[in-house]
Amino acid sequence: TARYTALVAKDAKRAAADMGKVLHVEIDPEDAKVERMAKDESNQFGLFSWEFVRRHGLHLFGTCSTWFLLDIAFYSQNLFQKDVFTAIGWIPPAKTMNAVQEVYKIARAQTLIALCSTVPGYWFTVAFIDIIGRFAIQLMGFFFMTVFMFAIAIPYHHWTLQENRIGFVIMYSLTFFFANFGPNATTFV
């Protein structure tokens, strides 16, 4: 990023040129300001120092804890999709199929979820990231993932009924959509 190029690599000219390309305007590099910041002793501290913890500890803890919670929810959904699809009756139990049929039906269900939710979530992020902004997209994604996960989890028995399968799949897909049109925005941008 331009911020890294200017503040860490100490190359204000390159940072200004990079941002000029992105914003389609000419930006004057502030070499003097970058040099002044580089010489400032208050900006010189180690990664494992109390100054680092004082300046960045709360943000780092907040970021790590939310990503940890997201990863538990997101990767659990991916790992246990087969069990979820079987529980709601979207695919038959494993004992009723041979191994090839089971793999085919699980792969088909996972592909449908990916094509109808995860991939569109990515493209929505690409389309709207410069309009809405990363931060707003991430907040919205975290919020709606939480809403849809609670909407699935709290009345779980409701979703296991035959007549509610389509609704479950839609809600389940929306959690994956908002994973990519949300927290994962910084992963692939």
Curated annotation (Swiss-Prot):
Intervals, Cytoplasmic compartment: 1-55, 133-134, 187-189
Any GO BP: response to symbiotic fungus
Family annotation (InterPro entries): MFS_trans_sf
Induction remark: Slightly repressed during arbuscular mycorrhiza (AM) formation after inoculation with AM fungi (e.g. Glomus intraradices).
Keyword tags: Cell membrane, Membrane, Phosphate transport, Symport, Transmembrane, Transmembrane helix, Transport
Keyword Magnesium recorded: no
Membrane topology classification: Multi-pass membrane protein
Sequence intervals crossing the membrane: 56-76, 112-132, 135-155, 166-186
Subcellular localization, as worded in the UniProt entry: Cell membrane
Positions in the Extracellular compartment: 77-111, 156-165
Other comment: Although related to the sugar transporter family, it does not transport sugars.
Listed name of the protein: Low affinity inorganic phosphate transporter 2
Organism: Petunia hybrida
